[in-house]
Amino acid sequence: MLYAFGERDAEARRLADFTCTALQLVNFWQDLATDWAKGRVYLPQEDLRRFAYTEEELSRGEVNGRFRELMRFEAARTREFFDRGLPLADRLRGAARLDVRLFSRGGMRVLDLVERAGYDVFRRRPTLSKLGKARLALETVLGIGP
């Protein structure tokens, strides 16, 4: 995608990797329940072990203290990827700059929703409302926020 925007240097690719990784991670956390139902688990095994949260608990959609700590850790790591990728937008022009900012901000907003739900992504999939999307787009176009 960077090539379509005219960016071909290694630094732009590095920044894009951070942004794309963050967006993919948000999607994983947002879709834990639906992915489990499809036989997919994207939580790293080492992190499950570190926080003593089992796949059996995951299969039941159990949100306990260990799960919240695990997801707090994953959310913090995801935010770091977003933060490291944010300078990419400043390297781009026009619609490309807006697109990257919009996607990054959208991902960060979904991550906010995951956190506000106490990391309980099993009862309700965190998504932006139509109003939330409109507000996000307006803020991005007007340059309000990060």
Name each model feature, range by range.
Residues L2-A22, T34-P146:
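Catalytic cores of Mg2+-dependent Asp-rich isoprenoid enzymes
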